[in-house]
Amino acid sequence: IIPLFLEAQELNKTKIDERSQMEVLTGLCNRDGLKSDLFKSYFEPEYQSYQINNLIIDSLRKSIKNTDLSIVIVMGTWCGDSQEQIPRFYKIIDTLGFSESNITLYCVDRTKKTDQGETNELSITFVPTFIFYEKEKEIGRIIESPKISLERDMLDILSTQ
């Protein structure tokens, strides 16, 4: 799924958003970029305040135990839904003990593109988009906002496999 050239890419690059004239992350990113001075004002409070449903987490933990699960996330640091859902997602995976090495995070501009075109083949229309893969085959997406909650929607995707 993830081409080898990504390992050589610079992480957490920023550029100026033309509409807001503010810095936004672009391209391949990770949690460190989201927790940097530019973006921690929304990441930390949302991460800390999100209340996880522990019953669903227990079921999720069982669902991912023996899987080859990987997740690609496409988000915009300029996007309110991304600012809300991405910290919640990280709290969920931290609670699950899910390895960040199985997560690829791309930040896009308002056209839903990166400068290097990494997301061009993913058919992104709204952000954030969480794409779940089992053994490199797409098994489901959460687009923009969850239907119920992130952890419930994740469980629903994994339960259909």
Each model region followed by its residue ranges:
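Short Fe-S-cluster ligation motifs
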Residues: T111-T125
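Conserved redox-active cysteine motifs that mediate thiol-disulfide chemistry
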Residues: T77-Q85
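Non-catalytic, surface beta->alpha helical segment in thiol-disulfide oxidoreductase systems
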Residues: F126, F132-Q161
